[in-house]
Design a protein with these regions (language model features):
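A generic structural signal for short beta-strands and their flanking turns/coil linkers
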Residues: 17-19, 28-30, 50, 73-77, ...
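HotDog/MaoC-like acyl-thioester-processing domains
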Residues: 86-88, 99-148
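Hydrophobic beta-strand-centered segment that forms part of the acyl-chain substrate-binding groove
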Residues: 59-93, 98, 124
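A conserved, well-ordered hydrophobic junction motif at loop->secondary-structure transitions
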Residues: 31-55
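Non-catalytic linker/capping segments at the edges of enzyme domains
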Residues: 1-38, 144-148
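Short, residue-level hotspots on alpha-helical faces of the histone-fold
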Residues: 11, 53-54, 58, 62
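Hydrophobic residues in beta-strands and at strand termini
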Residues: 34-36, 81, 129
Length: 148
């Protein structure tokens, strides 16, 4: 994405304090791989829950952008922290998908897995999707490309 003022903490590659998440498509899912550092901890060597929520929100927004070719706003996010994620983990996998649509409302499921493949965090989100034509006209967004 390249828009004037674009500096997303989740995905902007130029944001010096950002997570620099990159997404690709795997069937119905949008997927990212990311490695935490000690700068992302809450308790000693444990990935902060707020950082996990940020990752979940970002992946969910990307699934809307890619699968529906529009933008959306988060209305509700219900996160379940199932297992601690450690900041020295070899790398996380984030998976997000649209579970169902009702008019302009997307119901999204997103999960974070640790390097061993264990499900550590899962969330259900509700996003209000913007009208595609309005988004295209007002900000020039007509969809997005993902990493191959």
């Amino acid at each position: 994405l390249r828009f004037t003022g674009y500096n997303c903490i989740g995905c902007c590659p130029d944001n010096p304090i950002g997570l620099h998440l990159e997404f690709f498509e795997d069937g119905d899912d949008i997927v990212a791989h990311w490695k935490p550092t000690t700068n992302h901890q809450g308790w000693i060597n444990v990935l902060h829950g707020g950082v996990q929520a940020l990752i979940i929100d970002e992946a969910s927004g990307w699934v809307v952008a890619r699968k529906l070719s529009t933008t959306a706003v988060t209305s509700k996010m219900n996160v379940q922290y199932l297992k601690s994620i450690y900041t020295d983990d070899e790398g996380l996998t984030i998976r997000s998908r649209i579970a169902k649509m009702m008019r302009n409302v997307a119901f999204i499921e997103t999960e974070i897995f640790n390097g061993a493949g264990d499900l550590c965090t899962k969330a259900e989100l509700i996003f209000f999707c913007q009208n595609k034509d309005k988004v295209a006209q007002e900000i020039g967004f007509t969809g997005c490309d993902l990493e191959e």
